[in-house]
C-alpha cells in the first residue's frame, strides 16, 4: 500500500507473496509518482488542483498522455498495466479512500506463475474487495462517493 509523499509514492506496507516465489517492494521505499501505478491511481482520484500540479511538472509533450491515463483510471476504477520498472510484472492497482477522498493505493505486482491457480483478473477482484473493506474501515461510504465505480464490482 502506498501514499503520496510530495512528488513520490511512499510504500507504507508490503506483503510477501503466499507462493514460494514472488516479487515484493520494500516497506519504506520511495518512488517518483510518474513511475508507479500507485502514484497514478492516487492522482486519478485526487482533487483537480493536485492533478493539475502534477501535469504541470510533466514535459509538455507528455501531458496529454498523462492526462488520458488518469482519465482511464478514473473510468475503470483501477489500473492494470505492465510495470514500467520490472519486466514481466503486471501492476494491478486500486484506490483506497477515507472520509476526505483518496488516501492510498493498493498495488499487486502480479506475475503469472506456472501451476499457480490465480489469474490477474481474480487477483484484481480480490484487491478491489480488500480496498473497499479498508476504505470502509477508514470511514469511506460507497453510497455517498462520487467514485462509487472505483470500488464497486
What do the predicted segments below correspond to?
Residues 1-6, 15:
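Short hydrophobic alpha-helical segments used for membrane anchoring or interfacial signaling
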Residues 11, 81, 93:
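Short hydrophobic/aromatic beta-strand element in the GNAT-like acyltransferase core
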Residues 65-71, 76, 87, 103-153:
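Juxtadomain coupling helices with adjacent low-complexity linkers
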Residues 8, 101-102:
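Residue-level signal for well-ordered, solvent-exposed loop/turn and beta-edge residues enriched
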Amino acid at each position: 500500500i502506498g501514499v503520496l509523499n510530495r512528488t513520490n509514492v511512499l510504500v507504507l506496507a508490503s506483503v510477501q507473496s503466499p507462493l514460494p516465489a514472488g516479487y515484493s517492494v520494500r516497506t519504506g521505499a520511495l518512488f517518483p509518482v510518474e513511475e508507479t501505478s500507485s502514484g497514478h491511481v492516487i492522482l486519478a482520484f485526487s482533487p483537480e488542483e493536485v492533478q493539475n500540479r502534477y501535469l504541470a511538472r510533466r514535459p509538455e509533450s507528455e501531458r496529454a498522455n498523462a492526462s488520458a491515463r488518469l482519465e482511464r483510471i478514473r473510468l475503470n476504477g483501477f489500473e492494470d498495466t505492465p510495470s514500467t520498472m520490472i519486466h514481466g510484472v503486471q501492476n494491478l492497482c486500486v484506490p483506497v479512500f477515507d472520509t476526505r477522498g483518496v488516501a492510498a493505493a493498493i498495488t499487486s505486482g502480479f506475475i503469472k506463475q506456472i501451476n499457480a491457480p490465480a489469474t490477474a483478473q481474480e487477483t484484481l477482484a480480490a484487491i478491489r474487495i480488500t480496498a473497499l473493506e479498508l476504505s470502509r474501515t477508514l470511514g469511506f461510504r460507497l453510497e455517498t462517493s462520487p467514485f462509487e465505480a472505483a470500488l464497486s464490482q
